Every structure is written in structure tokens, then in C-alpha cells.
Regions:
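Active-site nucleophile and cofactor-binding loops and adjacent substrate-binding regions
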Residues: 31, 87-94, 115
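Conserved PLP-anchoring active-site segment centered on the Schiff-base-forming lysine
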Residues: 105-121
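Conserved N-terminal alpha-helix of the aminotransferase class I/II PLP-enzyme fold
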Residues: 50-92
Length: 153
């Protein structure tokens, strides 16, 4: 299947929409307009990096430049808002996961989860926010040789 005509049409429609929006006065508060500088930053590779953790203590390698950007943004935020501490990290999968968990779980419920090193998500671990809600978390038994959940245990 040749997707090029579809791609071309999609790009044309995006360009037309962009031109149209530049001629409008948008009075919908939730539809904020980003400056070209912000659009440039958000379309950079940094926007697609999985940056779990804090600067210099990330769970994944290769984020040294990301760390510097985050540290600068936090210092600017501290100065702008006259505060001693600022966290500029966007809500991520953890926020979505916790919203889902808290919608269906009750105190003392049990969650079985994979550890991060076995492919689980960092929001599934016992050391996380679950403690605040008295939700128990246990590791799924994992066979490191076959790299699979050990259903026999």
C-alpha cells in the first residue's frame, strides 16, 4: 500500500490548520499557543526520552544533556516563583497508573507486579506511592533464565 498520498494529505491539512489558526483569535483558555521556541524544544529528541528519576540519578543512561536542561529549568522556576525548590517534571505514566489503581483498589488490597529490571513499570513497585494508601505490593515470581513470570511459584 502506497502511503505517500495519505502522508502528503495529512501534512497539507496540518499546514492549512496552522495557517488558519494564525488568523484566529483563540478565546478557549485550554488551547494555549506555544511560542516557536517552545515548539522547537517540544519537537526535539528530549521530548521522547524516558527520564525516570532525578538529574544525575536516572534509571536509564544517556540523559546527561537532559539533566542539564532540567536543572536549568528548575533554577529558572525557583527564581521566577521565589521558591527554594521546584520540580519541572511533567506528570507521566506514573500519574496515569496511580489514578487507575486508586480508582479500583482499596486499603489492604494486593497488587502483584514485575520489578523494573524484569520489565515492570516503576509505578508498580512497593517502594512507591502505594504505601501512602496502605496498598500491598508483592513481586511476581520471575524466572531470570527464561525471562518470564514463574507461574509455578
Amino acid at each position: 500500500m502506497d502511503t505517500q498520498p495519505y502522508y502528503k494529505t495529512i501534512i497539507e491539512q496540518i499546514d492549512k490548520h496552522t495557517a488558519y489558526r494564525q488568523e484566529c483569535l483563540n478565546l478557549i483558555a485550554s488551547e494555549n499557543v506555544c511560542s516557536p521556541a517552545v515548539v522547537n524544544i517540544l519537537s526535539s529528541d528530549l521530548a521522547n526520552r524516558y527520564s525516570v528519576g532525578r538529574p544525575r540519578t536516572r534509571w536509564f543512561p544517556g540523559l546527561q544533556h537532559y539533566d542539564q536542561v532540567e536543572e536549568i529549568a528548575e533554577k529558572l522556576s525557583q527564581k521566577l516563583f521565589h521558591v527554594e525548590y521546584a520540580n519541572v517534571q511533567a506528570p507521566t505514566g506514573m500519574v496515569a497508573n496511580m489514578a487507575a489503581y486508586l480508582a479500583v483498589l482499596k486499603p489492604n488490597d494486593l497488587v502483584l507486579a514485575l520489578r523494573v529490571k524484569h520489565g515492570g513499570h516503576y509505578s508498580h513497585v512497593a517502594e512507591n506511592i502505594f504505601k501512602s494508601f496502605n496498598i500491598r505490593v508483592e513481586d511476581l515470581p520471575f524466572d531470570e533464565e527464561s525471562y518470564s513470570v514463574d507461574v509455578e511459584r
